[in-house]
Regions:
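Catalytic cores and adjacent flexible loops of soluble metabolic enzymes
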Residues: 1-345
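Metal-ion/cofactor- or nucleotide/acyl-coenzyme-handling active-site neighborhoods
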Residues: 342-535
Length: 535
């Protein structure tokens, strides 16, 4: 067993997705020396990418000559050094022969539609003397027939290894064993089989040791990847220190785990505090929907959807689109999901009756709702308005209705809404579903959004459109402060959106453009401080 399972550390390459490969020169050297001292079989020192310039603080290099500028003079012990090329990002002209390079091997990652030219590239690298690893990105996207075609190419080129790459952390043990057995059964016996895991389902380490144990009586070499403290893209990888410990304790391998722990303590934990990787809700949602994690990030970052809604949208992803991220595709799915068209004529008739002859005060979530409370209280005492808050129930104010457009905000307010159910009217857009029963008024979402706007479902503007259509003629506004990049924008920090500070000026400009148009049908008056222009 001892000789046919080997380990590869990919901290400096996969971990670099978290910090743009900017580890700092001292950390690069520190990690290198600790991995070598631990006796790990292979060390992946980073990416080869001709689009990048040389930086001694980064583990991403324009060519093989640049790798030697950082690592060339260091003692590598028994550890073999490899770099990685994402096929198409580093031309062969940027790669020296193995005799000229400090690298022993090169790993080539490629998606299935590029398998033929990528394997031809692997052949070129092999002819230059390198130990070559063919890395099957997104293994779960391969059908059995496609994998057999890839195996045909592998048996022709005969790289050092062909690796199962669970790019999105989708594999459970049964699926992993299926791919492993296909490779073990059909790939030339001189070619090693590799496994690169991701931790979306908290299975990276478990799958690795399951595979190691399944492989124990076979003569082929198995190569398992890991990284210090699991440092890697998104959900991260199998922790190399755990793999080394397992191999030491169960199979007599002489890895020095203490060296890895020193590297984690001195070099990796400070990075973890700053960047944080590992199992997360986003990683789980992506893996449970068998999809690219960017789809999840796109939807979650909208800050308008519940996780249930995110899952429902992701369930509509089709075919190869699931793992090949397409921003326009997910935007259209989001739009289609939110559309939920409905006939709201009866709802508007009801609102007209409810609001007939009333002044309306609309409360937003800006900090002035607290800072300028006396002005709001004075207005309520003088005008006795019908009070509507947007997507929240404010502390210290009695409201007559809540306008709901945002599923996430609604879920955060459910208990408060239930507590005030007897006296509170709920006006909701059709993209929301009530937890129990029906909303008092459900309005067509699609008719209220502006798809040309940077923030298409601006609840403030949507509210004003509703009031205009309901025949309201006198509207006071409080807590609509406008957005700023250098201060908190909400009275409660938990309501803050990350994108607001990035897009705040664009949102402000849009509101300034739309308010005069809405002001033609009704009087709009801000009674708290705002960045918006006077109407």
């Amino acid at each position: 067993m001892e000789g046919n399972v080997v380990l590869l550390d990919c901290t400096l390459r996969d971990g670099g997705y978290n910090n743009d490969w900017c580890f700092g020169h001292d950390t690069l050297i520190g990690v290198f020396e600790r991995i070598v001292s631990a006796g790990v079989d292979f060390l992946e020192v980073g990416f080869l990418d001709q689009r990048r310039t040389f930086d001694p603080d980064r583990s991403i290099f324009p060519d093989t000559a640049s790798v030697a500028k950082v690592f060339g003079g260091l003692d590598r012990g028994r550890t073999k050094l490899v770099g990685m090329i994402d096929f198409g990002t580093c031309d062969i002209s940027h790669v020296q022969t193995r005799a000229e390079s400090c690298l022993d091997g090169i790993r080539v990652i490629f998606k299935k539609h590029l398998r033929e030219p990528a394997m031809a590239f692997c052949r070129q690298l092999k002819e230059m003397g390198y130990i070559v690893f063919s890395q099957l990105v997104s293994i779960t996207s391969y059908t059995d027939d496609e994998l057999m075609d890839l195996i045909r190419l592998v048996n022709d080129v005969k790289p050092h290894a062909v690796s199962i790459v669970d790019t999105y952390g989708l594999l459970h043990k049964g699926n992993l064993f299926h791919y492993y057995e296909m490779l073990d059964r059909h790939v030339d016996s001189d070619v090693a089989v590799g496994y690169h895991s991701h931790n979306n389902f908290q299975l990276a380490y478990a799958n690795s040791i399951e595979l190691i144990n399944r492989h124990r009586d076979r003569s082929r070499t198995l190569l398992c990847d890991g990284s210090l403290f699991g440092m890697g893209k998104g959900a991260g990888n199998a922790p190399i220190e755990l793999l080394c410990m397992y191999m030491r304790d169960n199979f007599g391998k002489d890895y020095h785990v203490s060296q890895l722990l020193e590297a984690i303590d001195a070099n990796i934990l400070p990075l973890y505090a700053k960047y944080h990787w590992g199992y997360s809700l986003k990683a789980f949602v992506a893996a449970s929907n068998d999809c690219h994690p960017n789809y999840v990030s796109y939807l979650v970052d909208k800050k308008t959807l519940s996780i249930k809604s995110v899952n429902e949208i992701l369930s509509r992803l089709q075919g190869d689109k699931k793992l090949l991220y397409d921003k326009n595709y997910i935007e259209q799915l989001y739009v289609d999901y939110q559309r939920h068209g409905c006939d709201d004529s009866t709802a508007y008739e009801g609102l007209k009756i409810l609001l007939a002859g009333r002044n309306v005060l609309v409360l937003g979530p800006g900090k002035t709702i607290v800072d300028e409370r006396p002005a709001i209280v004075e207005h309520i005492a003088a005008k006795n308005p019908f009070v509507i808050s947007i997507n929240y129930i404010p502390d210290g104010f009695s409201v007559d209705a809540v306008f709901l457009t945002n599923s996430k905000r609604y879920n955060q307010q459910v208990s408060a809404i239930t507590a005030n159910a007897a006296s509170l009217k709920l006006i909701a857009t059709s993209n929301l579903t009530r937890t129990k029963g029906e909303f008092d008024f459900t309005l067509d979402y699609e008719s209220l959004v502006d798809r040309s706007a940077v923030f298409m479902d601006n609840s403030f503007i949507m509210m004003l459109k509703v009031l205009s259509k309901a025949g309201v003629r006198d509207v006071a506004l409080a807590g609509f402060d406008g957005y700023s990049s250098d201060r908190e924008n909400y009275y409660a920090s938990k309501m803050e959106y990350d994108f607001v500070k990035r897009l705040g000026s664009e949102i402000n400009s849009y509101v300034d453009k739309v308010l005069p148009e809405l002001g033609r049908s009704m009087s709009l008056k801000f009674i708290t401080t705002t960045v918006y222009k006077a109407i």
